[in-house]
Every structure is written in C-alpha cells, then in structure tokens.
Amino acid sequence: MDIHDAIHARRSVKLFTDRPIAREQIERLLEAAAQAPNHRMTQPWRFYVLGPEARRAYGAVLGARKAKKVEDPEAARAVVEKVTAAEAALPCEIAVSMVLDASPEIREEDYAATMMGVQNLMLAAHAMGLGTHLKTGAVMDDPRARAAVGVPDGERIVALIQLGEP
C-alpha cells in the first residue's frame, strides 16, 4: 500500500472481530514504530502488549473513573462492569509509554518521537488490514492505570492503542 493511500484511508476503528492478532504481526508493528525519528537516538518509547488480565485490570480502573460521574450506585456498578468487559474483550491492546528524561526540553522531544512511533504503528496496521483506535486522556496519569498496565516508575503512559481486525 502506498504511504499516501494509507495516510488518507486510515480511520479509527472501534469494533473488532474476536480473532486474536498473531505475535508476528504485533512484532512487525513494533518494528515499524521503532523506525520513528528521535533526537539524540534516545529511543524513548516503550510498548506493553496487554494480556487479558492487564486489559481487564485497566478496564476496571477506567470504568471506576467513569463511574464517579454517575450518581446512582447501581448504574455506577454497571458502568464499571461494561467498561471492564469491553477492555477485556479486545483482541489486542498496546500501552505506549515514554521514558522520562530529567530535562524538560528532551522530555518534549521524546514525547514527539514516541507519538511519531505511534503513528508509524497505526499506519503499518492499516497497511496490514488491521484497525486501530488511539486512546489518551487523564486516566494515563492514574497510578492505578500504571499498575494495571505494568509501567514502571520513570515512565509516562502516553497512549493505548486498541488493535484488531475490523
């Protein structure tokens, strides 16, 4: 697939088949991500392919955050259950973090490089016939989300990529 075609045709996909993504496909996507430019060759990105338990744990954290906006306790429990189940059902989810440099200038450059890696991964997935959906937001800074995903201190979660066959 021509890169221009991939750029113009790629769309966020929110519904996937339940078919798992092969390890070889994931490795190929991670190799594409690692080709992103990065100043000073810091290679600040880290990719965590979440297994079913990590997806479920992350879903519980996300669901609990969303449930705080719901006044009725029963409805709040339903939100947690729905979000947890939706995350657990994903065929693949990849958490993307970056190593935090002490220098604010380098941190900014590293964030840009990491997100270029995300774009590479998403375009490569599209070229392989896979769909992606990029997730970001305040939940990324939640210590419970970090624990669920397994991101160590010294790294910041910048995105989650949901991946599957459309």
Residue positions per predicted region:
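Short loop segments at secondary-structure junctions
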Residues: 52-54, 99-100, 165-166
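C-terminal edge-of-domain segments
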Residues: 87, 94, 160-162
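Residue-level detector of family-conserved "landmark" positions at structurally sensitive sites
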Residues: 43-44, 135, 156
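Small-aliphatic-rich amphipathic alpha-helix that forms the alpha element of a beta-alpha
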Residues: 33, 94, 100-147
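A glycine-rich helix N-cap at a beta->alpha junction
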Residues: 149-166
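Short coil/turn connectors at secondary-structure junctions
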Residues: 89-92, 130, 153-157
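Short Asp/Glu-rich motifs
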Residues: 25, 52, 144-145, 151-152
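N-terminal amphipathic, basic helical "cap/leader" segment at the start of enzyme domains
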Residues: 1-89
